Regions:
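N-terminal secretory signal peptides that target proteins for export/translocation
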Residues: 1-5
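Alpha-helical segments embedded in low-complexity/disordered contexts
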Residues: 8-11, 38
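Bacterial N-terminal signal peptides
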Residues: 10-22
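Short, low-complexity N-terminal intrinsically disordered segments enriched in polar/charged residues
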Residues: 26-72
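A beta-strand edge to alpha-helix "cap/lid" segment located at domain peripheries
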Residues: 29-35, 110, 114-196
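Charge-dense, low-complexity intrinsically disordered segments
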Residues: 37, 41, 88-91, 157
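A solvent-exposed, acidic/Ser-Thr-rich amphipathic alpha-helical stretch
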Residues: 63-142
Length: 196
């Protein structure tokens, strides 16, 4: 009887230990899942910030910030539809992108109010898919301007200058999300011409 009782206690102890080990394994798995979910949320927020910094830099004529959002070998192009060839571009690399969108802006000298006068980009409906250190993004945009870079504020009514969607590819480099490819698909645009 004494051995049976001891064996029962030992068996119960082993069972309890097995249960605790199993519980710890479940907690570790849950913690990993939680960390993965948190990383996904952080990635999404960081990618949205890239899109917002892009719009703000373009709106204010901050060429340095604008090109810093692209990888050194990034590609930028404009299309009427995703299946069609670009009607503007491709521009390859930061220097080519800067030359196209900020041809007369020296380094460290933002223009006042963007190159078309007061401008606002409205970017919305983000569809973001992250796969470790790469991501694809689709977002819609409307660009509103008060035309004339050298006209007094309020002298020209705001107009829609462009609208469409962004089809982006981003990569994480040195802990930062950057555009590796940006395709602007336009539904309406004016004044977009290649710079020589």
């Amino acid at each position: 009887m004494k051995y049976g009782r001891t064996a029962g206690i030992a068996l119960a102890g082993f069972g309890l230990m097995a249960l605790l080990v199993s519980f710890q394994a479940v907690r570790a798995t849950d913690a990993r899942k939680l960390e993965d979910r948190l990383r996904a949320v952080e990635d999404r927020v960081e990618i949205e910030q890239v899109l917002m910094r892009y719009a703000a830099a373009y709106n204010t004529g901050d060429a340095d910030t604008y090109v810093s959002l692209f990888t050194p070998d990034a590609v930028f192009e404009l299309r009427r539809d995703i299946g069609e060839p670009p009607f503007l571009g491709p521009f390859k690399g930061r220097d080519a992108i800067r030359k196209q969108w900020f041809p007369d802006v020296p380094a460290g000298k933002p223009t006042a109010g963007g190159q078309f006068g007061p401008m606002r980009h409205v970017t919305t409906n983000y569809e973001i898919a992250v796969n470790q250190d790469t991501a694809t993004v689709r977002a819609f945009f409307i660009e509103v301007v008060s035309t004339g870079a050298n006209t007094p504020p309020g002298s020209n009514p705001p107009t829609i200058h462009a609208m469409g969607r962004y089809e982006d590819e981003l990569v994480r480099r040195d802990g930062r999300w950057l555009f590796s490819k940006r395709v602007v698909v336009t539904d309406l645009n004016t004044k977009w011409e290649p710079r020589s």
